[in-house]
């Protein structure tokens, strides 16, 4: 998976000047909670940024006052067939998947099946880390907040084992580079380890648990996992990379094979409509349409800052109080507290930015590789919603 630093660098920027650009647009769902000029401004921004950053297709959801006010598809999910993006088109959401794993663990806390601060070896007795002291000390909280002391993503082998068990066996080969609980080090495989613990506790795969206890209650009927889920979906986005000479080049599906084992950290596939409902769950203290998915107490814990993120992650001067929570980043931008995450895998980018105090949020998904597109759109559209 690709690093998450660029999202943080973008959050402090100013609103883009908006202008219209001609491109295919597929409108599926629009509420009238916002005025027509606001929708026009959103369209203009999306289309301009898609043109600027060579994006084939994108999907957008806007949330205001606790309700979805706009869901829309732009451009093409497949350039070869000119198939348009709709609000039902599946995109890989990358590291936003980490918050789903954290939510699953939170549900088990509600059911008294697990404790965030109990050493994870209690749930995975065969676990071995390179330092025996860390083996006995690392907790689920530390795995979900990237504070386990295990090294950051860039220090792990590029080759991902094909199974979750293989990933877990590989932990013993990695050095402990910080005292558990002391330092933020963004570690995707640590979230996979938390998901593996969940599997041992509930006696089923992380995928089966997530579908039953998160997807089904949220009505995420088409959401899936990894490469297999995307390949089998009729309304899926083809991933692209931009080449200065050849234009938009399809990325072979084989490049996403690693997502199956790493699904708890970056392999969920979903539509913008489904992620919009997931955003509503976050903004309504664990409730959606009158159904409680997780307790309000645990939803607050998921969003509570756990560890300050280092200065090397903060390039935008307007960002304050940058922290990682449990599956989420948090920050204060111009006096507004944000809960957010981005996602990045080959041919896909995603962003979800929430302002809980205003019950507002933005979801942007794309089948291109421009972080500037997803993050710029999310930031600027949230500014509009908060005016």
Task: Report each predicted region and the residues it spans.
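Short, conserved catalytic-motif segment at the N-terminal edge
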Residues: 38-91, 113-115, 122, 130, ...
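Catalytic loop of the DD-peptidase/beta-lactamase superfamily, centered on the K-T-G motif
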Residues: 3, 9, 34-72, 155-158, ...
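Bacterial N-terminal signal peptides
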Residues: 17-31
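Active-site helix/loop module of the DD-peptidase/beta-lactamase fold
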Residues: 43, 57, 87, 92-96, ...
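Catalytic nucleophile serine of serine hydrolases
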Residues: 95-96, 185-188
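The feature captures the short pre-catalytic strand/loop hairpin that immediately precedes
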Residues: 165-177, 245-260
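N-terminal Sec-pathway targeting helices
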Residues: 9-19
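Active/ligand-binding-proximal structured segments within catalytic/core domains
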Residues: 101
């Amino acid at each position: 998976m690709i690093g998450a630093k660029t999202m943080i660098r973008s959050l402090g920027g100013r609103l883009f000047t908006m202008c219209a650009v001609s491109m295919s647009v597929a409108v599926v769902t629009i509420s009238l909670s916002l005025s027509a000029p606001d929708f026009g401004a959103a369209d203009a921004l999306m289309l301009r940024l898609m043109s600027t950053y060579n994006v084939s297709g994108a999907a957008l959801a806007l949330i205001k006052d606790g309700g979805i006010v706009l869901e829309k598809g732009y451009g093409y999910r497949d350039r070869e067939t000119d198939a348009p993006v709709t609000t039902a088109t599946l995109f890989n959401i990358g590291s936003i998947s980490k918050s789903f794993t954290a939510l699953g663990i939170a549900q088990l806390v509600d059911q008294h099946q697990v404790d965030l601060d109990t050493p994870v070896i209690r749930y995975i007795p065969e676990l071995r880390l390179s330092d025996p002291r860390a083996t006995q000390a690392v907790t689920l909280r530390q795995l979900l907040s990237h504070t386990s002391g295990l090294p950051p993503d860039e220090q792990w082998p590029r080759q991902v084992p094909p199974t979750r068990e293989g990933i877990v066996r590989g932990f013993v080969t990695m050095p402990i580079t910080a005292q558990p609980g002391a330092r933020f080090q963004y570690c995707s495989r640590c979230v996979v380890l938390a998901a593996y613990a969940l599997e041992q506790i509930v006696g089923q795969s992380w995928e089966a648990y997530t579908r039953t206890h998160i997807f089904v209650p949220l009505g995420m009927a088409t959401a899936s996992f990894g490469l297999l889920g995307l390949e089998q979906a009729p309304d899926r986005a083809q991933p692209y990379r931009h080449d200065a000479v050849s234009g938009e080049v399809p990325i072979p599906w084989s490049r996403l094979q690693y997502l199956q084992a790493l699904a708890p950290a970056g392999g969920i596939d979903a539509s913008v409509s489904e992620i919009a409902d997931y955003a509503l769950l976050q903004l309504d203290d664990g409730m959606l349409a009158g159904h409680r998915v997780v307790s309000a107490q645990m939803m607050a814990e998921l969003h509570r800052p756990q560890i300050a993120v280092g200065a090397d992650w903060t390039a935008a001067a307007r960002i304050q109080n940058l922290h990682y929570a449990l599956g989420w980043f948090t920050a204060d931008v111009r006096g507004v507290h944000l809960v957010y995450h981005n996602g990045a895998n080959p041919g896909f980018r995603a962003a979800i930015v929430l302002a809980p105090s205003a019950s507002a949020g933005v979801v942007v998904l794309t089948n291109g590789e421009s972080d500037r597109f997803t993050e710029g759109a999310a930031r600027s559209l949230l500014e509009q919603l908060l005016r």
